[in-house]
């Protein structure tokens, strides 16, 4: 495999050839009978088979009976030296040994070849292109000795077929020889290597030598005695037992043919593609080309037989199933035999040997450049050119159970053989290739985060090793051989065992020291006090007047120090409390300081902190920053993550009753999963961040946390009261359930007077500490909040009406039009469903139904339609670029994840750099996005967040602008979202823009939200109000519906342009804080948002206008009456249509066919807006020239896909409105362009001056003129130089083509009604809506047979021909055919006309024919 520097690798081979050769010979051929004579370094021995050979002295012990014969030989030498002869007893003993070896030698060899069965990876049937190694590379490769462990492996273990026993780390060269130079010269002269003389003996089996000794299917060896004979493949090194092969299942003829012509294994018989993989691509050699024998082997006559066998038999890897020619593995004639034996023994290729583990992840890829471009193309390659790019790649992968430190580059073919599914999935993602200028793996993935356990040289781990003190164990860091660690930026379940880093790698070594010391801190942690802590000193002696010295993460503000002392006092008096500071004042820092004081002074731990999932990482970071001496653990994520924390950090192995941590941070979503663990321990302090989650005493979180044992409870919330006072009482009940009952307090304070108000404040005061930014921060940046009212686009209006009109029965129940038997809960659920659909429509119509989007439009027009579909996107396309140009950084909050998806597409279209996270984002993704946005000189200008997930507990003070896309029912959610930017650390004025749609449910939502804000600070009002009641939902739905269904509204649509948006931003930047009035501060009220009226910012709060002239109960009646009126019209049209179908009246038609209907009913309008009623004007592009012209005498084509149902008078339209109908309706209101004509049209040129004569108003607007010849085809819409952006109803392509041609050739084509040049069917004076006929392309009245196309027999015959080729259902075609036949059977009456008119018409026809002929000639 090519290395990372794209150089060819050297082929290496093991240095013990006998170890890999001996198992392939019979016992008689490898059992030494006696030693004949001895030289300096070799012995001449005789085997039981009668063969004599020279063997090195140090290799004699590898042969059977070699040591025994050596002892006999040494004994014989000693006797010969002293006595000069050998006794008869010695000869008898030698003969006895020979007999024993002959009888038992084969049995011993069979016992030594027993194997374990194992399974390999998936098969991949593709040929491997071999690596081409030159003779110089092979001969110059250096040799290296075998490892000592391999020499100590006994014969039985060495022959076991198991990947664990293969020498994967063998680094010796395959192409090298371990002979000296003198020995090489002698072997070249002899043409044979002395220890390979067996290969050239008579009757040597080369087939057996080139095949593996293990069955591919059952992994068993050959046993002839039991009938398990091998069947050898003729094309590769695979072998099968006869019963395991497919031969028994074949018929007799096929089986005989295979036995005569050779057996081909299933892998070779398949038509596998000869892919252009890495090695062949780089070297220019492929197995698909004509076979080229390396010259070093072709010139050797002694190897001719071996080379001939190697031409047809290739090595096939057991694991990846690739094949490769043996002589491409090693072209050195002195070592090729050793290389063949090495691979046959090992069973796997080089890449499988180096990387035995499965693939976990594919990270990147890169393309290899061929060293021989002329040879890189394959003549016999079955792979298409488009697939070559995938097979000429290298992939950067990570193995299972390995860290990112051990990633490696691998070939495409090897990866396909090991993990084909992963490769296909990765290739389908269309990832960009590897960029050498950027790191493939983030640095954080290779830095140690936590050390869970270690293993010392003694074999013991950190918990079983015995050390006297923590210092002794800390010094033993040099004894650590492996460590079980997690990595920064990765989840805990990706932890693995790794050797400690080297000291030269400073960053990794520093992290390793920190992780090891934290592990020891956890192991040597002191036991938590079990008894309650009693303090005899008065609190005045304990109070902090300055910041404690052990709090070193930063400087506490004066109000934060007061908050620390207040929490300390609550704990001192054993009184639970609520820290209710406004968002952005640093409640987290105050709580961490409080925990530090308890631990430093009183050794008070453990502490349990419950936080939202989005803020877990932030809490862990702040705890490590402000209290580094605390042992902190986080219980979050999947079960694998939490199990690691439980097993290695929380539960003390020596004393399971005590927890081995000071602070445990757990997400609120995991409390239920880990409740059994939390109940085991007595927690000194229980802290709940975002304590408003406990507002419902029936929630599971309230129930489970109430069962956790704790000495002191503390809640953190910036919004203690959100909807009603009962929620506030529930918080107090959670803190002190023994003294406070929420239900009783609610009954007690249901009726409020002055005395009870004072009493209620006395109850709440000991629990709360509430401060706002304006009270404690002097130079805090101001905040300007502005509501931007918008008008719905036509698409939104249509969908809005449709949603309300579809729920007739429900609306009748609400307004009292019909009796109802359904319960109130069912009605409330239905109302909520309607409300959600309306809110989706107001956010973006694509959220309501994705089918509204036309996916066949060009990209530019598709994005234009996306903007024009929603009024909020229309203002964003003006507002966001201007804010970015002014240097603002923006946070965009939405409650719909689908809207964030749409915004992502829009930002990509606008090339705006952004970050995003929502509820589905992982913890690492969230923190990474926050860090990237807050980084100095960050290129990100926008941040997309969901209101619920991104509105709590995160710091985004680097942003100075907040845009709320859709208001929340709970105003505190929006306030928390705003507080992400308007918080401590902000240095700029914060601009807040809230987008709301006028005359819609959003107005009522904002109004109700303002009431809740008032309730938050004026508890005495509306205590018994239920804001989720059916009445409130009805009022929200009712709001705006009256104005929407009014036939003529007095108020115009709100319009915004670049000037008005520029003025909006400028005025907002000049305004002061919306809540800086002293009266608001003293009364502790929230300031209301100000409303932009397109001229200035109103100082009044947002007031919702209600029409007091109409009774509230009559709103739905107006809607119902309108819907019933429409239904009656539909019914009347249907009855009339049926009546016309039954009455077959004969209608008079003229002979001539006029393609233009020039009557006064034709209406054309100028569409100079984005869409009808849109407040955002867009410039209309005019057509300046035509690049292509008319074809040569082309006839009008009729689309065969036209729905023939429209010919029938029986109409099935106007059925129940569903989502599909709404999608079609909305599509017709979006920006659309005519689609390409499905017929091939040949265009020719035409003189414009001649065309002007043809298209003059003299001929076009004459109602008496009728065409006699075939209609002329006009060029399609796409050929016009400047694309005219159409917004409006979708029109017929023929109508648009005719209109654009005539309007571009002549300036006199104007409407006869209004005198304006406009699109067909868009006349502003039109009262009766006309429809465009799909047959003739002209507008005319429907309901009668008025189409000019039906007046001409030739046109009717064309329609019948087109109908016969149509794919419409047979019954529809039958009806349409009968209809057309009825037109043909009607009597024709001559047209009565005066002679003057006849002469005038004939003269016009003659002039027109001459003009057309002249145009054709040109």
From Swiss-Prot:
Biased composition (Low complexity): 135-148
Keyword Zinc in annotation: yes
Localization, UniProt: Nucleus; Chromosome, Centromere; Chromosome, Telomere
Matching Pfam families: Chromo_MIT1, Helicase_C, SNF2-rel_dom, zf-CCCH_6, zf-CCCH_7
Keyword Nucleotide-binding in annotation: yes
Signal peptide range: none
Zinc finger (PHD-type): 212-271
E.C. code: 3.6.4.-
Name of the featured protein: Chromatin remodeling factor mit1
Species this chain originates from: Schizosaccharomyces pombe (strain 972 / ATCC 24843) (Fission yeast)
Source organism phylogeny: Eukaryota, Fungi, Dikarya, Ascomycota, Taphrinomycotina
Gene: mit1
